[in-house]
Amino acid sequence: MEEDKRTFLRIPTNLRGRIRLLASDKELQLFREAPITSTSVSVMELKSAGVNEALVNALAGIDRKLDLLISVHSQDNLLDDFPHAVQIGEISGAGVKLTSTLPLEIGQMIECVITLTQVPIRMAGVIGRVVRNEDVSGVPGWAVDFTRVRDRDLESIVQFVFQTQRDELRVKMWE
């Protein structure tokens, strides 16, 4: 995230993530979040088909709960694939600053999965290179530049950054 090549807004944050170390920059990305699709029947479609509104609401509630259960199950697999926990202290579309008890080296390639929201769960996966060491309050920290990000994951990160900025502006407006 060098100053001269920064084209994304960087914000302070407190997100959790998981990483795995890569042997080279040629490794394929392991994390893949399913795209948001509209394969399920929408509430509006059920209502227009004449389904009772109480039943429509019950079915929508079940759908949300199933999504949550699937997310919890996916988290278990994530812990196996990405064994190292990290805290994300800053994020942008170009990289992150993270802290971890796992020692990293400058030049080390990592794959990182960032939990952007918890309910509903929204994650983004990136591959990046550790570019510098930056300890935070005595905890080892590193700046990581993204080297490969899928468009969908980049869009999720950028949306998170903008939503966070909007939320902060609204809070300041009421102070």
Regions found by a protein language model. Give the residues of each.
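Structured alpha-helical
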Residues: 1-175
